[in-house]
Amino acid sequence: EAFRQELHDWLDKNMEEMRQRRGRQGAQGGPGPDMDSDEAQQFTRWWHKKLHDAGYVGIAWPKEYGGRGATIMEQLIFNEEMAKHHAPGGVGGLGIGWAGPTIMAAGSEEQKKRFLPRILSGEDVWCQAFSEPEAGSDLANCRTKAVEDGDDYVVNGQKVWTTGGMRADWAILLAKTEFAPDVPKHRTFSYFLMD
């Protein structure tokens, strides 16, 4: 209950500033009606910074990577309190929920040092490049290919519905890298960090 009270008190204090800054409409669950506007993006980055500075971004991330190491119960409490207060999220949903955990699990130490702090702080915003014209969200049928070329990969294919793409600094890209016919489809893909 100490965590709930801490978060509740912080939200009570900071939601008033948020309402003054964005207006009543934005206080009811988001930055306002035009979420793609420059004004809405500035507001979202401002709010993300407040959450980050208070230690409420990436709360489930391990402490060694800048998170709180929150328990499942603390994550539930966080979500409940954010919803009760009609508090908007920050800019980092795909970075915090997808790119960051993947980098923690499979990335090099250099990648962890380079990307994780910037994901948490909101300095780098991430999008996903998964869906394709002929596959939609059926990821096993994606056709984009990545072929190794020295130290790099040459990517060839199409992506659609790039969630967050117009405001992103980085993308998580799913591309086929294994072409042997006997390999199951879901094992033919690699996960790329693309700028």
Where are the regions that the model predicts?
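Conserved protein kinase catalytic domain
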Residues: 79, 100-103, 116, 172, ...
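Short, well-ordered, mixed-charge alpha-helical segments that flank or form enzyme active sites
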Residues: 99, 111-113, 134-139, 162-164, ...
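A gly/ser-rich beta-alpha-beta helix-loop segment of oxidoreductase catalytic cores
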Residues: 107, 125-147
